Structure formats: structure tokens, C-alpha cells
């Protein structure tokens, strides 16, 4: 039930039901991003919010960020009323691009932020740190709605941070990913009082064992 796409929030539930006759207890989705550029089809599989479901032709769906995220909140309220456990993630652009970027801004194999850029991001009051807060502020109102509705969320931001593919990956040490994680926790929990979030440290794990 995890990672139903924000533009097609019932697709995977329907697939599971068609095979098993049962609905997953865990229901999940993604705050996502708007894919830009000439290679949007390369990122269709992860469900950019401005694209149609990856099960069909890759097309722009014409819906706004605000509409899609509000629809997500409404869907979550329905699923929670059914007794489902809700989990949310976020494939987010680099903060300077907010919600609209080429997918290569997220899947940055070769051009992850330099140590200097990372330091600016995680230093209070810098230009990039301010842009990061503005980016966070684009999803916080929707999480506040869920808090006010009494809905707990398994919140797993910056997933697979021990990999090498996302812009937030492969930043060890006290001033690396750990600092970004604590900064995010403090901003959501202490500044915005989002006490309905259960924070999930979502590492990557190999799919198989060598030689198995």
C-alpha cells in the first residue's frame, strides 16, 4: 500500500485488491514534485504530480500543486476513516527549485551538493536555508490539516539517505545528513507543532544478497 501516486492515489490499492481480494492496511503516498524539461518520461515511474499515472501514456495532467495536495489530504482522511495506517514521503527538488524541477535535480548521481553548498543549506539564516524553509512551507499546511483532524502520519522524509542517487544522499558526519534531518525535525515539530508525525528513518537496503 505504500507510494500510491498523488495523481492516482488508488491505483496500487486496486491492483492489490484485484489479486488478493483484500486492501493493504498501510496506505502511503508522496508529496512529490512537478517534473520539468525534455526528459520527464524518465521520471514517470516515481509519480511526479504533474504527470498522469505511469500505467499509461506519459502526459501532463493539468492539475495544480495545490489541488493535488489538497486532494491528497482528502484521500488520507477517507483512508484513515477506514482504519488504515498512513505513511507519507516526499521526492523533493533541491530547495532552490522548490516544487518544480527536472528530475535530475533529485536523482543527482554526479552533481550532488558540494560541501560548501551543503553548509549554506544547513546554516540558519543563509539564502539557501531560507529557500529550504519556503520549500518546507509548501507542504506544512497540508500536514497541519491532518494534525487538526487527529490523523497520525508515518512521516519518512529524505528516504534512502544512505544511497548515492538523491541530492540528500551520501552526506556522512555530524554536519552531513544528520544535521539536515535534525533541522527538518525541529522546523516541523518545534516551530510548526506537527505532533502527529511519527518520524521514520528510512534507509535503503539491498534487494538481495550477493551469491544468493
Where are the language model's segments positioned?
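Substrate-binding cleft of extracellular glycoside hydrolase catalytic domains
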Residues: 32, 36-194
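Surface-exposed substrate-engagement region within the catalytic domains
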Residues: 9, 13-18, 185-212
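Boundary/entry segment of secreted carbohydrate-active catalytic domains
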Residues: 1-33
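Acidic-and-aromatic substrate-binding clefts and catalytic sites of carbohydrate-active enzymes
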Residues: 3-11, 35-37, 63-68, 132-135, ...
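Hydrophobic faces of well-ordered beta-strands that scaffold small-molecule active sites
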Residues: 1, 25-29, 86-88, 153-157, ...
